[in-house]
UniProtKB/Swiss-Prot annotation:
This is Transient receptor potential cation channel subfamily V member 5. The gene is Trpv5. It comes from Rattus norvegicus. Constitutively active calcium selective cation channel thought to be involved in Ca(2+) reabsorption in kidney and intestine. Required for normal Ca(2+) reabsorption in the kidney distal convoluted tubules. The channel is activated by low internal calcium level and the current exhibits an inward rectification. A Ca(2+)-dependent feedback regulation includes fast channel inactivation and slow current decay. Heteromeric assembly with TRPV6 seems to modify channel properties. TRPV5-TRPV6 heteromultimeric concatemers exhibit voltage-dependent gating. Detected in kidney (at protein level). Detected in kidney. The keyword Transmembrane applies.
């Protein structure tokens, strides 16, 4: 019985995995069965084909059951709505009014009503007819097809109102609200219609629909619809940050923006920092953004006023405190290292019993370890080390439960492996203390490990510097990405060739060929060969087996030439990918560090940033003032663009005239000059690099996307353009 139960659990897990793999096939089968059931049923077929004659005949047929359903549990009204057959749907509602409130019974469309389908198809007339005949504007479609998952291509929520908002039909939205649809309704994930709009791929109409729904948010509610959180505690604003929806984020920020004054190209604005400022919030917006799995979320850090707020906090409080913390940790590690170097040792009392035993010192027992003045000085350092380890654990452990172990240890921007390293180090220090108090031998093992891990943690403080911060992420990605994959390949190669070398030399004299005398030694020698630490560990003064030469030749080609160079290429690719986004990663590191320090530091050492609205009659909210500089005359830039067009056109014409000086080609040149009057945006390679680069700068500036660091590259040297 004890053996059978685990086998049943394993079988259930395998069946679940197979069902997940065959999800698409399962859905395909359901839709095929649906078409089959529609074809076999005269009522469903007539609803699909809008066959009014058949429906009238079935209407007078007493044996016809209008409650019959298809393979998915759908009624004839569902089928008519699915195929946009308004006449058939109206006849069915007149014949069987109860069909209006009927929903689909089978997965994956459980709970779907004809109203949901009509809204999806944006059939306004059918929606109006359904609502007029009593269709519920609050019906919920709870099937798996309406969940937010990788299996589904769309996520429209569960309520008809969210369906209408997601398809972008303002008329249907107004109809539903007039018929009692609750705009504050939440689905099984706790998402309101505003949350669902944030998740839509079409950002433009989502913003328009967002405003429309907010205009209907009235009543005596204590909290605005925008501040209603979902099951994860995310408001629509925070969800936009987590998803990296910069369009929706900017749209919401414009609603919080108040222009104070405008003077020529300068504009002074104040931004409401509600939900943005992480000061005093358990679920920080900034922390949610930097810990998001989506790369687009990091673009939020470049938006106003987030960029200005982070810069203010980092320069005023974050950077000084972080540098001070880094120096304290270095002094702490120096103290720990000194205590380890001068640990209590004495000369060994017992005689050596083996010729290979080279130990001359041993650890002192607890009674002899703290006797002299030097021992008492070391005791002070050891107490500092132990207290520091306890403080580290008290700081780290609450964050593990607050954030979650997987995100806390797995996200490189939040610190990732450094948290594992520092917690392991602190645990080893406490283990050393226990071993010292109990006079247990072998403390050299945790001491050596703690020294390595403790000094490696110093790299964590490099994130305070723009030049060094991204390199720590680069090292992490190489270790946990490239190196792990390479180690799997290396293990297979070493295992295979070590076995081959051992078999080849198994019949030889081990005194002459000690490198492959036994299997463990053969494994280690092959590992050294793989890393080119040693060269061909064989005794060439004796006859070697013929297979050794062939095997060693194959090993040298595969290991040294192929795999090591492959590993170098993999690390080079990782370096290139991280280098492309190094500035973005460093900003994310700065935000994560700022939020961490703000959460840990006492409030009197880290006051709240911004302007309190209470002092100026703006309520209990905080604001940040930002000054913008805008080009006062955009037509001046357009003139620069036209100047570059004409100069580039003349340059191309000169080059073509040099290549085609003969009179027979004049017509071709003339025709070419006509084409050159409207040069394409992608300039020809014959143009000079300075002119081409200048054109790109002006074109991007005109379109409002000027970003020299990202679009035109960095590190190419400073170039000055004279207009």
């Amino acid at each position: 019985m004890g053996v059978k139960k685990p086998w049943i659990q394993l079988q259930k897990r395998l069946n679940w995995w197979v069902r997940e793999q065959d999800w698409n096939q399962h859905v395909d089968q359901l839709h095929m069965l649906q078409q089959k059931s529609i074809w076999e049923s005269p009522l469903l077929r007539a609803a699909k084909e809008n066959d009014m004659c058949t429906l009238k005949r079935l209407q007078h047929d007493q044996n016809c059951d209008f409650r019959q359903r298809g393979a998915l549990g759908e009624t004839a009204l569902h089928v008519a709505a699915l195929y946009d057959n308004l006449d058939a749907a109206i006849m069915l509602m007149e014949t069987a009014p109860y069909l209006v409130t009927e929903s689909t019974l089978c997965e994956p469309f459980v709970g779907q009503t004809a109203l949901h389908i009509a809204i999806m198809n944006q059939n306004v007339n059918l929606v109006r007819a359904l609502l007029a005949r009593g269709a519920s504007a609050s019906a919920r479609a709870t099937g798996s097809a309406f969940h937010r998952s990788s299996h589904n291509l769309i996520y429209y929520g569960e309520h008809p109102l969210s369906f209408a908002a997601c398809v972008g039909s303002e008329e249907i939205v107004r109809l539903l609200i007039e018929h009692g649809a609750d705009i504050r309704a939440q689905d099984s994930l706790g998402n309101t219609v505003l949350h669902i709009l944030v998740l839509q791929p079409n950002k433009t109409f989502a913003c328009q629909m967002y405003n429309l729904l907010l205009s209907h948010d009235g009543g005596d509610h204590l909290k605005s619809l925008e501040l209603v959180p979902n099951n994860q505690g995310l408001t629509p604003f925070k969800l936009a940050g987590v998803e990296g929806n910069t369009v929706m984020f900017q749209h919401l920020m414009q609603k919080r923006k108040h222009i104070q004054w405008s003077l020529g190209p300068l504009t002074s604005s104040i931004y409401d920092l509600t939900e943005i400022d992480s000061w005093g919030e358990d679920l920080s917006f900034l922390e949610l953004v930097v810990s998001s799995k989506k790369k687009e979320a990091r673009q939020i850090l470049e938006q106003t006023p987030v960029k200005e707020l982070v810069s203010l906090k980092w320069k005023k409080y974050g950077q000084p405190y972080f540098c001070l913390l880094g120096m304290l940790y270095i002094f702490y590690m120096i103290c720990f290292t000194t205590c380890c170097v001068y640990r209590p040792l004495k000369f060994r009392d017992a005689n050596r019993t083996h010729v290979r035993d080279n130990t001359v010192l041993e650890q002192k027992p607890l009674q002899e370890a703290y006797v002299t003045y030097q021992d008492k000085v070391r005791l002070v350092g050891e107490l500092v080390t132990v207290i520091g380890a306890v403080v580290i654990l008290l700081i780290e452990i609450p964050d593990i439960f607050r954030v979650g172990a997987s995100r806390y240890f797995g996200h490189t921007v939040l610190g990732g492996p450094f948290h594992v390293i520092i917690i392991t180090y602190a645990s080893l220090v406490l283990l050393i203390m226990v071993m010292r108090l109990t006079s247990m031998n072998g403390e050299v093992v945790p001491i050596s490990m703690a020294l390595v891990l403790g000094w490696c943690s110093v790299m964590y403080f490099s994130r305070g510097f723009q030049m060094l911060g991204p390199f720590t992420i680069m090292i992490q990605k190489m270790i946990f990405g490239d190196l792990l994959r390479f180690c799997w390949l290396m293990a297979m190669v070493i295992l295979g060739f070590a076995s081959a070398f051992y078999i080849i030399f198994q019949t030889e004299d081990p005194e002459s060929l000690g490198e492959f005398s036994d299997y463990p030694t053969a494994m280690f020698s092959t590992f050294e060969l793989f890393l080119t630490i040693i060269d061909g560990p064989a005794n060439y003064s004796v006859d070697l087996p013929f297979m050794y030469h062939l095997t060693y030749f194959a090993f040298a080609i595969i290991a040294t030439l192929l795999m090591l160079n492959l590993f170098i290429a993999m690390m080079g690719d990782t370096h290139w990918r991280v280098a492309q986004e190094r500035d973005e990663l460093w900003r994310a590191q700065v935000v994560a560090t700022t939020v961490m320090l703000e959460r840990k530091m006492p409030r009197f050492l880290w006051p709240r940033s911004g302007i309190c609205g209470c002092e100026y009659g703006l309520g209990d909210r905080w604001f940040l003032r930002v000054e913008h500089h805008q080009e006062q005359n955009p037509y001046r830039v357009l003139r620069y663009v036209e100047a570059f067009k004409s100069s580039d056109k003349e340059e191309v014409q000169e080059q073509l005239s040099e290549k085609q000086p003969s009179g027979t080609e004049t017509g071709t040149l003339a025709r070419g000059s006509v084409v050159l009057q409207t040069p394409p945006l992608s300039r020809t390679t014959s143009l000079s690099s300075n002119s081409h680069r200048g054109w790109e700068i002006l074109r991007r500036n005109t379109l409002g996307h000027l970003n020299l660091g990202q679009d035109l590259g960095e590190g190419d040297g400073e170039e000055i353009y004279h207009f």
